[in-house]
Amino acid sequence: MGIRKKSSKTPPVLSHEFIIQNHADIVSCLAMVFLLGLMFEITAKAAVMFVTLQYNVTIPVEGVLGEQASLYHYGIKDMATVFFYMLVAIILHAVIQEYILDKINRRMHFSKTKHSKFNESGQLSAFYLFSCIWGASIIVSENYFSDPISLWKGYPHTYFPFQMKFFYISQLAYWFHAFPELYFQKTKKEDIPRQLVYIGLYLFHILGAYVLNLNRLGLVLLVLHYFVEFLFHMSRLFYFSNEKYQKGFTVWALLFVLGRLLTLILCVLTVGFGLARAENQELDLSNGNFNILAIRISVLASICITQAFMMWKFINFQLRRWREHSSPQPSSQRKKTTSAKGKASRKEKENGVNGTVTSNGADSPRSRKEKHS
């Protein structure tokens, strides 16, 4: 994310700079078109498809005579709903940036490198915190903690409550909104491949859980993963404000490893044992049943490969830091390299994302001046 420089000159209409500076207003007008469409009978049917959740069904509650529950399933019309809430995510992104993060940046006087990373961590920490609270409330209300067998019991989980469907729609909308944000935030070309991989992994796993009717397992894994990621980005925010705050990274490193282990355990229990012992193991697209051996192996393989990739990046990052800090040096050079080591360790803290060093780890203008002096 680059720094958006405010100039006194108004850029030409429909130019790149004009769109970047006013993208929140443009998107707000587009979202208002859908909301205004609800007011007119001619356009109401089309507007409802974008604004409200689709595929609502009423099912009688088991064991309770005369009581019915309103549940949802997924379909092609969900793409329209995801598009509308993607617009909402772009607007909220701009609001957080302008009214919270930009004000903090002006007070802290960050370098260009720290500025972009502070914005990234600020946006993601807000999203992860909101998603954790929302997802945890669904888990508690549906009793997934007290009854973990429900993660695979009764599969396929074709129908799910309003809150769970809205949660998945919001997750997809947020990660799809990250694509245009690469343009709006003037992301550096060398950072785009890393961001595309990061966004693509989220969309791949969320869409997989949503389409394969593994929504319960996906919800639990997302909350677990988001909690660990929230700790990392909060630790990085505190580190940017004061470089003495480094204990948060130690806590994050421990929880990162535990999070990977818990993810693998839950996936093996649910997919490898729970679904493998289910009676209905035939592919039935009409009923949303994907419980066959090939799909189970594919699900486990994709999750295991992703977790192994994250751990490999994490271990390499930690080993690199450990070698740099523990490498023996002559006593005559220790005093000369003390300040250089401090700067290197600070860069590692700033550039780390999920245990990896990001590609925009170049020296900031401020640090260059210190070195030349």
From Swiss-Prot:
It is found in: Endoplasmic reticulum membrane. The chain crosses the membrane at residues 31-51, 81-101, 121-141, 159-179, 195-215, 218-238, 249-269, 292-312. Keywords: Endoplasmic reticulum, Membrane, Protein transport, Translocation, Transmembrane, Transmembrane helix, Transport. GO terms for biological process: protein insertion into ER membrane; SRP-dependent cotranslational protein targeting to membrane, translocation. Residues 2-30, 102-120, 180-194, 239-248, 313-373 are cytoplasmic. Residues 116-325 form the TLC domain. It holds the Pfam family TRAM_LAG1_CLN8. It is a multi-pass membrane protein. Residues 353-362 have a biased composition (Polar residues). GO terms for cellular component: endoplasmic reticulum membrane. Residues 333-344 have a biased composition (Basic residues). Residues 52-80, 142-158, 216-217, 270-291 are lumenal. It comes from the Eukaryota. Residues 325-373 are annotated as: Disordered. Its main location: endoplasmic reticulum. Belongs to the TRAM family. Stimulatory or required for the translocation of secretory proteins across the ER membrane. This is Translocating chain-associated membrane protein 1-like 1. It comes from Xenopus laevis.
